[in-house]
C-alpha cells in the first residue's frame, strides 16, 4: 500500500472520534498558572496543549511552519469541546490539531516521494515523521486519531532511515508476561560492535523524536543509540506504566549481549524527564550492565510527591501522567496517592549509595524538576556530576548542555 493510500485509509472523514482534551476526566484543580520550561515548552492562553517550540525546532521544524499550523487551528470556526481552547476542535477536519499537523506532514511526505536525491528524500521523510508525532502529541491513551498519526510517523521514520547516513535496524525484544516491544537501533558509520546509549524518553514523546540527539551528538563520536517507547505508548502501548517503571528497559538491557552490533560492555542510559526515573532505576538495579547514566530535567521525586509542585503543573501534563497510569477517571487525590509511589526516594532507591556514575542536568526554577532532584541523583552516586543549564538563550544553552553531557558519557563509555 502506498503512503498516500495508507493516509487516506487511516484518516477517513469521520466526526465521532473522541477529542483529545476529553480523554482524561479528572477534577480540575482550578486556575492555571503560566508555566515555561526548556524541555516542555510553555502554557499559552486558550490552548489545551503546551506549545513546545524549542523541542519542535530542535527536531527540525521551521518556526514559521509551527506558526502557520497554529494559525489554521485558531482561524477554524468548527465546533470545539471548549470554545475557550483553540485546539479542541471535534472530529478530523479543518482546525482539529491532529488534522492540521497531519496535513502538514502529508505535504512533506509527498515531497519525499517526489524527490530523486536519496539524502534529501530521507530528510523530507524525517520531517514528515516529526510532524506526524506533533499531530499525535501528547499521545493520550484512547486517542484513535493520534494513534493513526503515530502509525504514519513510524512508517515515515522507517522510510527516512533507509536513506539517511548510518544504519538503523528495527529490533523486537521479548518481555515475559506480555507482548514483545519494538525498538530502533541507530548505528554510525564504521564497524561494530558500538558503544551504545539506551534512550529513556519523556512521557509525552515517542522514540522516533530523538533522531536529532543521535545525529548531532552521538553519531559523530561513533556511539550508537537504541530507543524504545515508554510503557503505554507507541510500540509499547500494550504495557501499562507501573511503579516498576524500568521493566521494559531492563529486559532490553538483558538482551544486548545477543545483539552483535552492540558492545554490551559499554552501555549508557540517558533519561529525559520521566525517562530519568527509568534511567536512575536502571543505575541501581542493573549496575553491572550499565557504565553510566545521564539525566536531563529528571522527574524522580518532587513532582511525584509534592502537592504544591503538582498544583503548578499544567492540566495537559497531569492528563499525560493519568493516562500513562491508566487513571482516566481518577480524582486528583487518587492520582496524587498513586504518583507518590513512583518517587525513587519513596521506593527506597535514591539516597542509597549507587556505584554507577550519574550526571544530572537541570534548569533553575524548572516547574517539573527542581534542582533538589538533580542533587539527590548526583549525591547518591559514587561518581556524580551536577550540571546547571542556564535558561537564556534557551536553544544555544540546550545545545551546549547536550554537548557537555555527551562529552561526559563519551569519556566514561569509549
Curated annotation (Swiss-Prot):
<keyword id="KW-0719">Serine esterase</keyword>
<dbReference type="Pfam" id="PF06500">
    <property type="entry name" value="FrsA-like"/>
</dbReference>
<dbReference type="InterPro" id="IPR029058">
    <property type="entry name" value="AB_hydrolase_fold"/>
</dbReference>
<comment type="similarity">
    <text>Belongs to the FrsA family.</text>
</comment>
<keyword id="KW-0378">Hydrolase</keyword>
<dbReference type="GO" id="GO:0106435">
    <property type="term" value="F:carboxylesterase activity"/>
</dbReference>
<dbReference type="InterPro" id="IPR050261">
    <property type="entry name" value="FrsA_esterase"/>
</dbReference>
<dbReference type="InterPro" id="IPR010520">
    <property type="entry name" value="FrsA-like"/>
</dbReference>
<comment type="function">
    <text>Catalyzes the hydrolysis of esters.</text>
</comment>
<dbReference type="InterPro" id="IPR043423">
    <property type="entry name" value="FrsA"/>
</dbReference>
<protein>
    <recommendedName>
        <fullName>Esterase FrsA</fullName>
        <ecNumber>3.1.1.1</ecNumber>
    </recommendedName>
</protein>
